[in-house]
Amino acid sequence: CYSAKGRSKTILQEETLKTALDFFIRKERGDNLQIVFSGGGDPMVSFDRFRMAVDYAFYKAHKEELKLDIDVVTNGSLLDNQAIDYIKEKGIGLVVSFDVLKDVHDTQRSHYDIVASTISKLIENRIGFGIRCTVTPLNVNRLCETIEELHKRFSNIKCIALEAVINKELFSGTDKLREFYDSFIENFTAAKKIGKQYGIDVGNTEYMNAAAFQERSCLGKFVLTPEGNLTACSRISSSNEDFHDDFLYGKVCADSIVIDYDRYNNIMEEADAYLPECKDCMARWHCGGGCLLARKTYSKEYFKEHCRFICRITEIAQNDNELD
């Protein structure tokens, strides 16, 4: 699993959770709020704590007269009947990380049979959910096969996100990263055509962003880690992660919250559409300076290849939108 490095055996303390939720769920923040449970490992590792947090969040939202959407990103291996029933009862949005092809999934994540069985249960229970497939050098040339298998095995699923991995360790040089991105675009484009035949929406973050206008790729987040730290990136799920300290801007304790707003603002200014290198880029207002975590993960030369990839897929998406 690509969040494996961020796995932590630490479980958020109940009082810390309540303090964070009390701070976040307030009328002054707007009428519609969203909470997402995700991170290294899986939110379902501690279902009792997950249920406590959800129940308390909905209680607070009702008290504040707010609409609250709750979503969970899970690898699907721990979604038992109790969890499935609860998710259905509460109307919780669900994304399952699933690489579709058995050999790929078992190599990259493991527990294919368990996850596939869980997906079947979700379909039987008429629970809406999305599929997120991580694309690496292992499966980048098998995206058409991925869509064919998805249709064959789970014909009810009509939406899948194919997301290119961000991991420098998988690419020995910039030429290998460019080769990967070129293969991704070629195979993603072909997979979209197959998906269209089956009524499957084949998406991708960069492709979707082509229809958006944004000054910053990712708005800063109020991310609470198991240790009670606050980070600005949803992929920084524990202090075990690389770049944890780069995104750290606060701390939540049982009865207090400390936020360094200057630090937060500095993080927000590290990547946006106003960077000098973005000035003449055609994708400037769609990618919003690019993912800050990607900027930190890749060296300057590697990130140039990442930018080239974003420009190419943005251009393809815009052409597709014109044809539609």
Per-region residue spans from a language model:
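Conserved G/P- and acidic residue-centered "switch" motifs that form tight phosphate/ATP-binding loops
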Residues: 42
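Short helix/loop capping segments that flank catalytic or ligand/cofactor-binding pockets
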Residues: 232-233, 290
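Flexible mid-to-C-terminal extensions adjoining Fe-S/redox cofactors in radical SAM and related proteins
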Residues: 240-324
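Exposed loop/turn and edge beta-strand positions of beta-sandwich/beta-sheet ligand-binding modules
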Residues: 31, 218, 277
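N-terminal pre-core extensions flanking Radical SAM catalytic domains
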Residues: 1-5
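Radical SAM enzyme [4Fe-4S]-AdoMet core and its adjacent flexible, acidic
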Residues: 18, 103-231, 237-247
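Radical SAM/AdoMet-radical enzyme domain recognition
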Residues: 6, 10, 17-38, 46-165
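Generic recognition of stable, solvent-exposed alpha-helical segments in well-folded globular domains
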Residues: 15, 48, 52, 117, ...
